[in-house]
Swiss-Prot record:
Keywords: Cell inner membrane, Cell membrane, Chaperone, Membrane, Protein transport, Transmembrane, Transmembrane helix, Transport. It is found in: Cell inner membrane. It comes from the Bacteria. PANTHER family: CYTOCHROME C OXIDASE ASSEMBLY PROTEIN COX18, MITOCHONDRIAL, OXA1. GO terms for biological process: protein insertion into membrane; protein transport. It comes from Chloroherpeton thalassium (strain ATCC 35110 / GB-78). Interacts with the Sec translocase complex via SecD. Specifically interacts with transmembrane segments of nascent integral membrane proteins during membrane integration. The keyword Lyase does not apply. It holds the Pfam family 60KD_IMP. This is Membrane protein insertase YidC. Coiled coil: none annotated. InterPro entries: Membr_insert_YidC, Membr_insert_YidC_N, YidC/ALB3/OXA1/COX18, YidC/Oxa/ALB_C, YidC_ALB_C, YidC_periplasmic_sf. HAMAP family: YidC_type1. Belongs to the OXA1/ALB3/YidC family. Type 1 subfamily.
Length: 586
């Protein structure tokens, strides 16, 4: 990584920081004001979380609370377990909810299986208000499982349907059906409401996911930073991030939504609608415990229409719960892959989706070690950008050769800026040099370099994959934990950033420069220091990529310096030009 690349990285980083500040979602209003505006905009909307709190506090008779559905508020809970090739899920007859979801191939930081469902009462239920003022959360009702089997084991393309049902004597019926496949993290979720058209207020019901995803990483604060709720509607995503403690964040836009989801750093739970929806509901809060660790709790819902003139309403959904792996979430066919953060939509994301990930997957099919894959990838990118590096080096060498003339002119016309600019432009023109030629090739490859940053920062493929001294390429390769924290640097010492700083230092010594000796000396130490600080808290896989990119840059720069020579730049000496003699008249 040459000096121009580093300068470009710094400049674009500053631009990105400014962009994020300008384009960041507006901070939600305080709860009371937000609720007032929401009620004015959607008078019939159901405030799900408030109802949950209210219901949990009530000690009322089930009939008073749920009306004629109160008879199902008392019962005996039974559990049904489904084991597939990828996970083990547990369903409960209380609420027909999903109680646990334990992946087989992905463990927590202790290398133990963990339950992605954080809500102790389970998740996935229906919400609706009745015309007599009752608010029904089916998660509190006991369903009848339409199977006597308690354990299922399926694999491959085999599927199993598990229906739950409650029905009243007057013909009202709620049926919830799960459809699991043996080889997919995505499963079907179907609802059937019969006789509720004139029973439900607002002609609307909601399918709800309750709770954030369980923490699985050692650095819970970092995991919380990368956790949020998001919806895809109107061709774009809407994100809700509970970024501050003791604040409640809410969004409930109207419109046809393809999906609404909750994610952590490496996992996601998404509700995907197979038909038109009325909008989404998202709510989140950030909580801390006594140890100052953070957990972000979310609730999301899809809103669906329930016409009063229809006796039966059937709705189909799918639920994806599992790793945030690009190919897997893209396979849902719902554009759920949009929830993976690849940076700017029209700048870095295309590089990530159509270049970096396909090449990474190709290498993954032929190489077992992710560390080796990263090294090969760095070599590939260096070879691809070689023409740009060559063009940049040639331009910088020409600029370096012009420095004596430029300094002389600057001294000669230091009191005449206009004349100085004109003379410098003339020299550039005569020498055939573009002053931006040294940095323009670097700027062109900046989107690719930043796309690499986003991909390696969020790639689950690197999670818990070791290489050399690093036990996990998705976290810093710390070799020493400090008893204190250094501002910007952190509370640990990582090896790869130190090696990167050394590589950047030597790479700069090989790179042609147009700067003065004092400037060169300053930059020689500034950029290695910046790399040391910046990458100390980054995933070691990302650091390994940039380290090897710099090592290959050193080799490439050495080769260029040995095989190319600077063509002498010959300028006309105007002071020695003689006037042509006048032609004699005959």
């Amino acid at each position: 990584m040459d000096r121009n690349t580093l300068i470009g990285l710094v400049l674009i980083a500053l631009i990105m920081m400014a962009w994020f500040q300008l384009m960041a979602p507006k901070k939600p209003l305080p709860e009371e004001k937000a609720q007032q505006e929401r009620l004015e905009a959607v008078a019939e909307s159901i405030d799900i979380k408030n109802q949950l709190v209210q219901d949990s506090l009530q000690k009322a008779n089930p009939t008073q609370k749920f009306g004629e559905l109160g008879q199902f508020a008392v019962g005996e809970e039974k559990k049904i377990q489904i084991e597939t090739d990828l996970f083990t899920a547990t369903l409960s007859t209380k609420g027909a909810t999903l109680r646990s979801f334990i992946q087989k191939d992905y463990l927590n930081y202790k290398h133990e299986p963990f339950n992605l469902i954080s809500n102790e009462d389970g998740t996935l239920s229906l919400f609706f208000a009745t015309r007599d003022g009752k608010v029904v959360n089916t998660g509190e009702l006991y369903f009848d499982p339409k199977t006597d089997q308690k354990n299922f084991r399926i694999s491959g393309d085999n599927k199993v349907r598990i229906p739950f049902e409650i029905s009243t004597e007057d013909g009202r019926r709620i049926e919830i059906t799960y459809i699991f496949s043996g080889n997919s993290y995505e499963f079907g979720y179907e609802t059937n409401l019969a006789g509720f058209g004139k029973f439900v207020s607002g002609n609307e019901y909601q399918v709800v996911w309750t709770g954030g995803l369980s923490n699985a990483e050692k650095n819970v604060n970092d995991e919380a930073t990368n956790s949020y709720a998001e919806a895809y509607l109107g061709g774009s995503t809407l994100r809700l991030d509970a970024s501050h403690v003791d604040e409640t964040y809410k969004e409930q836009p109207s419109g046809n939504a393809k999906w609404v989801a909750v994610r952590s750093k490496y996992f996601v739970a998404g509700l995907i609608s197979k038909e038109e929806t009325e909008g989404v509901f998202m709510e989140g809060s950030r909580n801390t415990n006594d140890e100052k660790s953070v957990f972000e709790d979310y609730m999301v819902a899809l809103k669906l229409k329930l016409p009063s003139d229809q006796t039966t309403v059937n709705s189909r959904f799918s639920v994806y719960i599992g790793p945030l792996k690009y190919d897997l979430v893209k396979a849902t066919g719902s554009e759920l892959e949009k929830i993976i953060d690849f940076g700017w939509e029209w700048v870095t994301r295309p590089f990530a989706e159509y270049l970096i990930i396909p090449i990474f997957n190709f290498l993954n099919n032929h190489v077992d070690s992710y560390g080796v894959i990263i090294i090969l990838f760095a070599l590939f990118i260096k070879l691809v950008t070689y023409p740009l590096t060559m063009a940049s080096t040639k331009s910088m060498k020409k600029m370096a050769a012009l420095q004596p003339q430029l300094k002389a002119i600057q001294e000669q016309y230091k009191d005449n800026p206009e004349k100085l600019q004109a003379e410098i432009s003339g020299i550039y023109r005569e020498a055939g040099v573009n002053p931006l030629g040294g940095c323009l090739p670097t700027v062109i490859q900046m989107p690719l370099l930043f796309a690499m940053f986003y991909v390696f920062r969020s790639s689950i493929q690197l999670r818990q994959e070791g290489f050399l001294w690093s036990n996990d390429l998705s976290v810093p390769d710390s070799i020493l934990d400090l008893p204190f924290s250094i501002p910007l640097y952190g509370d640990h010492v990582s090896v790869i950033p130190i090696l990167m700083g050394v590589a950047v230092f030597f790479q700069q010594k090989l790179t042609p420069s147009t700067q003065t000796n004092d400037q060169m000396k300053f930059m020689m130490y500034l950029f290695p220091g910046m790399m040391l600080i910046f990458f100390n808290n980054m995933p070691s896989g990302l650091g390994l990529y940039y380290l090897m990119f710099n090592v290959f840059s050193i080799a490439q720069q050495f080769y260029i310096n040995q095989t190319t020579e600077t063509e002498p730049v010959v300028l006309k000496d105007k002071s020695k030009q003689k006037a042509k003699p006048a032609r004699k008249k005959k």
